[in-house]
Curated annotation (Swiss-Prot):
Its EC number is 5.1.1.13. This is Aspartate racemase. Substrate binds at residues 48-50, 85-87, 167. Keywords: Isomerase. Pfam families: Asp_Glu_race. It comes from Enterococcus faecium (Streptococcus faecium). Homodimer. The lineage of its organism: Bacteria, Bacillati, Bacillota, Bacilli, Lactobacillales. Belongs to the aspartate/glutamate racemases family. The keyword Isomerase applies. SUPFAM superfamilies: Aspartate/glutamate racemase. The keyword Endoplasmic reticulum does not apply.
Amino acid sequence: MENFFSILGGMGTMATESFVRLINHRTKATKDQEYLNYVLFNHATVPDRTAYILDRSEENPMPFLLDDIEKQNLLRPNFIVLTCNTAHYFFEELQAATDIPILHMPREAANELVRQHTTGRVAILGTEGSMKAGIYEREVKNLGFETVIPDTALQEKINYLIYHEIKESDHLNQELYYEILEEAVERLNCEKVILGCTELSLMNEFAEDNHYPVIDAQSILADRTIERALAERNEALDTVSEK
């Protein structure tokens, strides 16, 4: 297979399924051959990223992720998509282990703030691990935006939605989701809310009548993935036609 990309997912699996669904549905295709070529690594047994970030005595996910990168080096995709926000804590080490470009989901989400001409405060929602590591805060602040991190009470609600409702119970609790967004916009006085966890993106995919100003990181990554894959496919076709 030529002109393909690789998806490094499984963290978690339902969120990865959501990402794959997005790229398939958003790719404009009228026949099988017009869809995108990709390989999916659904590495569900990667140890919990947040658990390790919060407590270094927990099992380190890095060796598992590096093993995945070594396999990518053998396959030689055009680029790699990492569909776990918290795993971007290891991004620099992962990118250093390969010459294949890895798309940076938090950076793409931060760039979307610029595209949408954001001027106000930006709330960042995600796992405790990504909050502690500053994965999104760093990218957003680098572009000059004021960031707001959830306080303990709000973070507990986010944790409950991500881990208990979605990961453990496979339940998309729309009422709790909207309660969290309302707090971020109204109580924290934020113009935009970044969904910096793929479980939150999964929640957003199926939320009805969502009028909150969210920046859905996974949705944006899906769009950038499609754009890049199509551009590289077209470039390859142009090269062939010139010969």
